[in-house]
Design a protein with these regions (language model features):
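C-terminal, helix-dominated tail/subdomain
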Residues: 310-315, 364, 375-429
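Short acidic alpha-helical/loop segments enriched in Asp/Glu that coordinate divalent cations
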Residues: 296-308, 354, 368-375, 388-391
Length: 429
């Protein structure tokens, strides 16, 4: 009897999940597994938690949702905690697994873990296969090799849109043959070394983890309200649930896939018509792809102070007082303060806000951009390694910005995007 293990990571869904579909089609029985990686709940070299309370809570909700969905298909989620390179091989031995399926990684730490697991499995004579589950386009479908991907997004976008095709999403399985999977017992946040986040009524949305919540949000934003048709005009908003799609927390944990969203956008366009706004949502998904492919190309460079630039630069020394003012929203700028308080209290911030607080941190406060990126890694409910570090490098002038150092005039930005001070009043009064 052929037994396979599906190692879930940031692909916590049953829709459009190639690892799951492949394992089911090529095996007699499948064991879905999630390993709570203890290294994800440590403190980084910058002094921040690798995973903060907001994202950890969202993750636990997503795991609960995945388990419930798997149970309806005749399976369940087997949860282990520790080092994946220790825990996955243990399960391979216990369940006599011949093959492990997992999503393909691109970032340095994730790749290192993947390699360790692969090495341990090789010693056991167990096969290991990875699938691309996080992008709109498959790397092998791009009109260039990874090493030849253009360093400017516009060049990448134009050629990709012209010469590559987005594959159709995989349908969700209807049945999974599994041995009996023990009931899911999730740790609480205290066991992960975290405090329970306090709910703030001013938050843009009460984000709930899991695929079903993701699909519900997509249905709301597209078919229930047709807000997608005005996305391009409203996406720079800062107050309320619906100025933007807010899909990012679910995309970050893979509760929904870019290809699934794309297919739904196409269905929406067939029903309500295509326009600049419907295109713009896909355009933003392409940015996510771009940063992911850039990570594949440049490997560890996005974690260096000089980023992907060739000239060496001396990193700036940390000013603890300025960092504390930035984190706690007590700087000289009320616009920056409002954004940083929103992030601290809710784990979320608008795209417009993120660009401004990053520019302020790098240019006005003259701090090492990586410290800001590391704080975002802790705090964001929608943290995605490639998007976070890629965007921070971009705004610090050491990433993929063709214009070099990008400087935001914070006062002008506040006047343009928070004209009546509604956002500042919400968070500062």
């Amino acid at each position: 009897m052929k037994s396979a293990l599906v190692w879930f990571k940031t692909d916590l869904r049953i829709q459009d999940n190639e690892t799951l579909v492949k394992a089911i089609s090529k095996s007699d029985q499948v064991i879905p597994v999630y390993c709570i990686d203890e290294s994800h709940f440590t403190t980084t070299s910058y002094g921040f938690q690798k995973t903060g309370s907001f994202r950890a809570q969202f993750l636990l909700e997503a795991l609960q949702d995945l388990d419930e969905q798997l149970r309806t298909l005749g399976s369940g989620l087997l949860l282990v905690k520790g080092k994946p390179e220790v825990e996955i091989p243990k399960l391979v031995k216990a369940y006599r697994i011949q093959k492990v399926y997992a999503k393909r990684e691109v970032a340095f730490e994730e790749l290192a873990t993947e390699k360790k697991v692969q090495t341990a499995l090789f010693k056991l004579g167990c096969d290991f296969e990875t699938c691309s589950t996080s992008t709109l386009y498959h790397a092998e479908d791009l009109p260039f090799s990874i090493k030849d991907i253009p360093e400017v997004f516009t060049n990448f976008r134009k050629k990709t849109e012209k010469d590559a095709e987005i594959r159709a999403p995989f349908a969700a399985p209807t049945r999974i043959s599994s041995p009996e999977i023990p009931s899911l017992v999730l740790p609480d946040l205290a066991e992960l070394g975290l405090e329970k986040p306090i709910t703030d009524s001013r938050a843009v949305l009460p984000f709930v983890g899991g695929e079903r919540a993701a699909i519900q949000r997509l249905k709301h934003y597209l078919f229930d309200t047709q807000l997608l048709s005005t996305y391009k005009e409203t996406r720079n908003g800062m107050v309320g649930a619906d100025y933007s799609s807010k899909f990012s927390p679910w995309l970050g944990l893979g509760c929904i896939s870019p290809r699934y969203i794309y297919a739904e956008v196409q269905r929406y366009e067939a029903q309500f018509g295509a326009n600049d706004s419907t295109y713009w949502l896909v355009f933003e998904l392409l940015w996510r792809d771009y940063f992911r492919f850039m990570f594949k190309k440049h490997k560890t460079k996005y974690f260096l102070y000089e980023g992907i630039k060739t000239e060496k630069v001396l990193s700036k020394s940390l000013n603890e007082k300025l960092l504390s003012q930035w984190i706690n929203g007590t700087t000289n700028s009320d616009f920056i303060n409002a954004n940083m308080i929103e992030l601290k209290q809710t784990g979320f911030m608008s795209n417009r806000g993120r660009q401004n607080v990053a520019s302020y941190f790098c240019n006005e406060l003259q701090q090492d951009w990586r410290i800001g990126a590391a704080y975002f890694e802790q705090q964001l409910i929608d943290y995605d390694v490639s998007s976070n570090w890629g965007n921070w490098a971009y705004l610090a002038g050491v990433g993929n910005d063709p214009r070099g150092h990008r400087y935001f005039n914070i006062e002008k930005q506040a006047a343009d995007y928070d004209k009546n001070k509604a956002f500042r009043k919400l968070w500062l009064e």
